[in-house]
């Protein structure tokens, strides 16, 4: 999108307005902007106190292939091409994995993810590029790596470098995108594990009945409720 106002429905008589009220005092979030908004929100009210854990948004499209482009557009060109959620994600991915300081739940989750992608994605500091290394030790450029592998590897990196912690919040758009059914199941099992053991809250948007069904099966196995919100027209 060229400007923020493009997010407003063309036929809408008024601008876009959002308001969310928490059950805690002074924890309301509200903002609004019109079709003419370029890059700034017109009115915004945010909580004074921030959550202790980091929050991150994982888009449907992986960002490893666009990594240098996103950084350059924001830090060099100063252009409005990628919103802050993309910029925040690539900045979080820049953090190198920490050794010996990770939670056991994260280590177990990373082990499961490594089996799904049959290897791992890492960053080469010398070349400044991402690469995929399979379990046989073969290296591949990130451009020649499957979309699903890159998507899962983003989560692996965030678990490894300490960006995610207890009470973090993860927003995932179209989790099923570029993933085969087995990978979807493993990914959701991993999210359920870290959510249960670490208190991480996960919000998932999906168009897939398969994802909803898997979440239903997960909910049957654990006492914690899995909330599902269905949106429809009319």
Range-by-range predicted roles:
Residues 1, 131-234:
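Switch/communication elements of ASCE P-loop NTPase nucleotide-binding domains
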Residues 1-167, 234:
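Phosphate-coordinating catalytic segments in nucleotide- and nucleic-acid-processing enzymes
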């Amino acid at each position: 999108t060229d400007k923020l106002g493009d997010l407003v429905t063309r036929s809408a008589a008024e601008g876009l307005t959002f308001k969310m009220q928490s059950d805690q005092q002074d924890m309301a979030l509200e903002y609004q902007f019109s079709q003419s908004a370029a890059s700034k929100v017109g009115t915004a009210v945010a909580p004074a106190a921030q959550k202790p854990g980091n929050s991150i948004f994982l888009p449907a499209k992986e960002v490893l292939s666009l990594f240098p482009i996103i950084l350059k557009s924001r830090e060099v060109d100063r252009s409005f091409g990628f919103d802050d959620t993309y910029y925040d994600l690539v900045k979080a991915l820049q953090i190198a994995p920490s050794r010996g300081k990770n939670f056991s739940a994260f280590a177990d989750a990373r082990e499961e993810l490594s089996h799904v992608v049959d290897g791992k994605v890492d960053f080469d500091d010398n070349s400044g590029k991402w690469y995929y290394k399979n379990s046989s030790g073969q290296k591949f450029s990130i451009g020649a790596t499957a979309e699903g592998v890159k998507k899962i590897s983003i989560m692996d990196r965030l678990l490894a470098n300490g960006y995610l912690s207890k009470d973090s919040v993860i927003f995932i758009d179209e989790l099923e995108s570029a993933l085969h059914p087995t990978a979807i199941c493993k990914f959701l099992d991993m999210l359920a594990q870290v959510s249960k053991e670490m208190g991480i809250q996960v919000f998932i948007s999906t168009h897939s009945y398969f994802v909803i069904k898997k979440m239903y099966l997960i909910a049957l196995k654990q006492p914690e409720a899995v909330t599902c919100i269905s949106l429809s027209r009319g």
